[in-house]
């Protein structure tokens, strides 16, 4: 293995736009096969490939994502993740150690996260019972700090486009790290939104304005983050197989004055009154994040301020009269067949 420059090895045809790149290893395929015992321990899978656990000769545990298919689209997503992660470093983002390319095989090598993804934790009754509110709050706050870095502090103004519990990994201390940058895109400084040619993301977490207009912005991530908060607190899926959405359920509870019913029963029974008040505040903030009007949504910096300053009053959530956008839109796939577990792509029809 040799330490190699990302642009020199993968993107020779691209002009170098910045000197602030993070160097990492280019692994040869034999090294990856040896580290993963010939890809014997599958620890995850998604719309972009399979993830295997491995161990390098120095003892470091790694996770290796191998693209499931080779196509122009998947290669573009592979290159996109490499280029973006080569410029990013934050304690709440996954640490990319290197990559491997050989013929039609493409792999990314990450640090290994022993507690898997957040969705595996909160949607498993046994593991979810181990999470008290303090742990959940720290996870939520960590995700928000990672998003603030992407949106405001990295200098790239990155929109992730697929924030969800499945793209949040937990380390040994349950500290969250954002992963899944295949669909991410950068914005120009001062750019409020960018036109896209296709809708990408995960059912239940997709920004309604993004779906309607094809324009993506950092507020699209704020929307998905709001759904993620509600998923953590309720331990419910964003989209159930019967076609009901978590957002609709939470709004019904809020309108009836029964927001406490959103809190998972184990947490509701075990937490003290002060903690319950704090959880209800987080539900309130989440509802502001999932406002159907992107302009009314807070930016992530304001969300973090609301988290840390309990005395700051919150505006009332605004619920439109429209049905959720997933019900308004004639999707080429059924949401009930893909309830928040895999990323989906839909072309934007001409308007």
Curated annotation (Swiss-Prot):
Binding-site residues, ATP: 43-51, 65
Return the Gene3D superfamilies for the record: Phosphorylase Kinase, domain 1, Transferase(Phosphotransferase) domain 1
What is the documented function of this protein? Forms a complex with CRK36 that may negatively control abscisic acid (ABA) and osmotic stress signal transduction. Involved in plant response to ABA during seed germination, early seedling growth and responses to abiotic stresses by inducing the expression of ABA-responsive genes and stress-inducible genes. Acts as a positive regulator in disease resistance, downstream of NPR1 and WRKY70.
Looking up SUPFAM superfamilies in the UniProt record yields:
Protein kinase-like (PK-like) (SSF56112)
Source gene?
CRK45
* Deletion phenotype: No visible phenotype under normal growth conditions, but mutant seedlings show increased sensitivity to abscisic acid (ABA) and salt stress during post-germinative growth. Increased susceptibility to P.syringae infection. Weak expression of pathogenesis-related (PR) genes after infection with P.syringae or salicylic acid (SA) treatment.
- What molecular function does GO assign, one term? protein serine kinase activity
- Compartments reported by the entry: Cytoplasm, Cytosol
Q: How does it assemble?
A: Interacts with CRK36.
Query: What is known about its processing and modification?
Result: Autophosphorylated and phosphorylated by CRK36.
Protein name as it appears in the record: Cysteine-rich receptor-like protein kinase 45
Per the record, residues carrying Phosphothreonine are 197, 202
Question: Which part of the chain is the Protein kinase domain?
Answer: 37-287
Cite the PROSITE patterns for this sequence. PROTEIN_KINASE_ATP (PS00107), PROTEIN_KINASE_DOM (PS50011), PROTEIN_KINASE_ST (PS00108)
| Similarity comment text for this entry | Belongs to the protein kinase superfamily. Ser/Thr protein kinase family. CRK subfamily.
> What does the entry list under GO cellular component?
cytosol
| Alphabetically ordered keywords of this record | ATP-binding, Cytoplasm, Kinase, Nucleotide-binding, Phosphoprotein, Plant defense, Serine/threonine-protein kinase, Stress response, Transferase
Q: Which InterPro entries match?
A: Kinase-like_dom_sf (IPR011009), Prot_kinase_dom (IPR000719), Protein_kinase_ATP_BS (IPR017441), Ser/Thr_kinase_AS (IPR008271)
Reaction it catalyzes: L-seryl-[protein] + ATP = O-phospho-L-seryl-[protein] + ADP + H(+); L-threonyl-[protein] + ATP = O-phospho-L-threonyl-[protein] + ADP + H(+)
Q: Which residues carry this modification: Phosphotyrosine?
A: 110, 210
Induced by what?
A: By ozone. Down-regulated by light stress. Induced by infection with Hyaloperonospora arabidopsidis. Induced by salt stress, drought stress and abscisic acid (ABA). Induced by salicylic acid (SA) and infection with the bacterial pathogen P.syringae and the necrotrophic fungal pathogen B.cinerea.
